[in-house]
Amino acid sequence: MPTINQLVRKGRHSKVTKSKSPALNYSYNSMKKESVFNPAPQMRGVATRVGTMTPKKPNSALRKYARVRLSNLIEVTAYIPGEGHNLQEHSVVLIRGGRVKDLPGVRYHIVRGALDTAGVEGRKQSRSKYGTKKD
């Protein structure tokens, strides 16, 4: 417990919260060739690799992912939600924050139904999350 005098001299410091999706916090200034702090909710990128990976211990599956080079030149691993996808190398995708709990290092999701990513075929419920149009 600090004394009043210590509080007057040093004061209280507020906690610094760390971002859960740090790649979305920066944009790239190509004229100055430098990163600029400019947080964004989503970001566009180009898929450099599309593949599958296996989840952590209690679970078993082949989860689809894409390695994406963002418009701020940062490369991240993003999860492709839903059943089936049309992504391949050089597809332009939109990513948002949001981790996948059983895939280490995957902190981003690809937005279905935006840019080159098609919505999930035959989806009837929660369509807005998977970019599916109403029949």
From Swiss-Prot:
Region described as Disordered: spans on this chain: 1-20
Keyword Cell division belongs to the record: no
InterPro entries listed in its UniProt record: NA-bd_OB-fold (IPR012340), Ribosomal_uS12 (IPR006032), Ribosomal_uS12_bac (IPR005679)
Annotated GO CC locations: small ribosomal subunit
Molecular functions (GO terms): rRNA binding; structural constituent of ribosome; tRNA binding
Source organism superkingdom: Bacteria
UniProt keyword list: Ribonucleoprotein, Ribosomal protein, RNA-binding, rRNA-binding, tRNA-binding
Record-level GO BP terms: translation
Biased composition (Basic residues): 9-18
UniProt xrefs under SUPFAM superfamilies: Nucleic acid-binding proteins
Subunit structure: Part of the 30S ribosomal subunit. Contacts proteins S8 and S17. May interact with IF1 in the 30S initiation complex.
Protein's job: With S4 and S5 plays an important role in translational accuracy.
Family indicated by similarity: Belongs to the universal ribosomal protein uS12 family.
Protein name: Small ribosomal subunit protein uS12
The organism of origin for this protein: Lactobacillus acidophilus (strain ATCC 700396 / NCK56 / N2 / NCFM)
Lineage: Bacteria, Bacillati, Bacillota, Bacilli, Lactobacillales
